[in-house]
Design a protein with these regions (language model features):
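Extracellular loop and loop/strand-boundary signature of outer-membrane beta-barrel proteins
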Residues: 27-30, 85-91, 134-141, 188-194
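Surface-exposed strand-loop-strand hairpins of Gram-negative outer-membrane beta-barrel proteins
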Residues: 28-43, 69, 144
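Residues that define the transmembrane beta-barrel architecture of outer-membrane proteins
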Residues: 20, 36-40, 93-99, 143-149, ...
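Predominantly the C-terminal beta-signal and adjacent terminal strand-loop region
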Residues: 66-67, 151, 158-211
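Cleaved targeting-peptide boundary
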Residues: 18-26
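Sec-dependent N-terminal signal peptides
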Residues: 4-13
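Membrane-embedded beta-strands of outer-membrane beta-barrel proteins
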Residues: 24, 40-42, 99-103, 117, ...
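Gram-negative (and chloroplast) outer-membrane scaffold detector with strong preference
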Residues: 46-134, 159-162, 198-211
């Protein structure tokens, strides 16, 4: 009996580190810099306790939009310009790639349902295609970077012993930017920064698998 209890205890200790997870997330992201749109992501993780896990995630958000703030500034500083020309100048196409590491804590509601809270930090790459000011038919290309963080809450419902359906709402914070020199309006050359406020709320649903 004593040997059986020892073996059971050892197996119990070893079970938790073997709980790997993989999740696909789909939803809506509404950052301050752009119009809201579809976001897709993958999250992997590993349980180090029955109700605690570390995780990593990678997301992709794409938006093709007209930068209203920039267009208003162009209309203000260049009132004689054609409105359609300034709208073309403000046309922007972005691809956002946040990559994060985090920790999640679960709180059981019932045998099949759980509430959870999560927090993550990481880095972000923003690929930006925007219009050349002098010749708006030509595209300019830049890559912006920043650190980011994210906090959120969600609820999960088991649909089988190895999978669950979940929904969550999170707040994401980041301001990817790049610097450039302006030799037209500044002498000596002025070093300026262009920043995109990619902070905002996202709501997502998905399926998580345990293996």
């Amino acid at each position: 009996m004593k040997r059986f209890l020892i073996i059971t205890a050892l197996l119990t200790v070893n079970i938790f580190p073997q709980w790997n997870t993989g999740a696909i997330k789909l939803g809506y992201f509404n950052p301050s810099a752009t119009e809201g749109g579809f976001i897709i992501g993958f999250e992997g993780g590993k349980h180090f306790d029955k109700y605690m896990s570390w995780n990593w995630s990678a997301d992709w958000f794409h938006q093709n939009y007209v930068d209203k703030k920039l267009m208003n500034e162009l209309n203000q500083f260049y009132p004689g310009a054609n409105g359609e020309l300034n709208e073309l100048r403000a046309s922007t196409n972005i691809h956002d790639f946040p990559i994060m590491l985090g920790v999640s804590a679960r709180f059981p509601i019932s045998k099949r349902a759980q509430f959870y809270a999560t927090g993550s930090i990481g880095g972000e790459m923003l690929i930006v295609n925007y219009r050349n000011f002098q010749n708006p038919t030509n595209d300019e290309f830049e890559v912006a970077f920043d650190f980011n963080w994210r906090v959120g809450v969600g609820a999960a419902f088991a649909i089988s012993p190895g999978s669950e359906f979940f929904g969550e709402i999170t707040y994401h914070e980041s301001h990817p930017s790049w610097t450039y020199e302006d030799n037209e309006f500044y002498y000596p050359n002025g070093v300026l920064e262009r920043s995109y406020n990619m902070s905002g709320f996202m709501t997502r649903v998905g399926i998580r698998f345990f293996y």
